[in-house]
């Protein structure tokens, strides 16, 4: 058993327990004790690590990203979503090769780990992606993920062909039998997929008994496209198809009205909130406070580096908090506790993984990050730790990261990704 001593622990559990000068005990991959110092636990330890007053919190959960796009960082700034996609992103992705995408994913894994992210939910354009190579890279990194091929409607492939190709990838991923590398059915969006493909995607998700992952209600332009095409707004259209009755992660959820918020509250949908990407593409500000009050699970996400332009979840959480205060006109909204939970346990709920990760509790996987505040002026005074973790911390402040009790980042250097 390994014990981390002299640590200040932010558990992000249901009651948001915080233990100052506490200990965290890990046996194999699981947490076996978290709390104030316990002499019996210390006596049983095979190894005691003196953390010298460091801060420990759960590994961060990135609920929506596109790691294969890491090579497109900075490809196009100052464009709205649809111009950005059609004029720059999709043409660039058409030129992807396995060498390019594997390199991009490894770079994303490195960036995520260095900034404290331990779990991510990925949607990737299948063009130029070798799933076997990606699996080996993610497996070596020790990160946990959903890695899902995106479905699009096109002139070069029928719906049946797209579904068959996607099913093949799903079966390949399932064949790995790796609980840390899973898959969802990921139709890109209501505007880039035909009705037939959206229906077939839902059928495939039911058949494979896996969740859906889709961009929904991201922009006013999307709402206009779907209203013109089907006579309904995006959420109503997907509800008609049955999407709200299947476990799903909806990325964005910016353009939602009161009736749609109420419908989401009675659905199996969770929201991946991408505040910085939504700002950069001028998409809008998601009604996160209203979603949370309605009981909808909302996690934080970075989207891709092509629209962000980094994978810094701490920056994302800070931006989310500031935006919700501004949007509501009430500075008490989205407080520190809510922000830290959104980065961790709420993200785990979005991905259906809250029984395994997202908080530091006995029986859960030992996924956590360590920040040593000593010598970092912007993290002083140290007694205001919780405030600093939302409003002052930088991704570069992360010193160490553990996944399943195994160290994957040491002194800011990633140990498990070979670039």
Model-derived regions, located:
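N-terminal metal-binding scaffold of metallo-dependent hydrolase/deaminase domains
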Residues: 1-42
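C-terminal cap of metal-dependent C-N hydrolases
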Residues: 12, 365-416
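Active-site gating loops and adjacent loop-to-helix segments of metal-dependent hydrolytic enzymes
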Residues: 71-103, 141-142, 146-149, 155-156, ...
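Alpha-helical scaffold segments that flank or form the walls of functional sites
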Residues: 73-143, 164-176
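Metal-coordinating catalytic core of metallo-dependent amide/deamination hydrolases
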Residues: 129-254
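Glycine-enriched alpha-helix->loop->beta-strand junction motifs that scaffold or abut catalytic
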Residues: 142-144, 202-210, 243-246, 263-272, ...
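His/Asp/Glu-enriched, well-ordered alpha-helical/loop segment
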Residues: 240-247, 289-375, 392-393
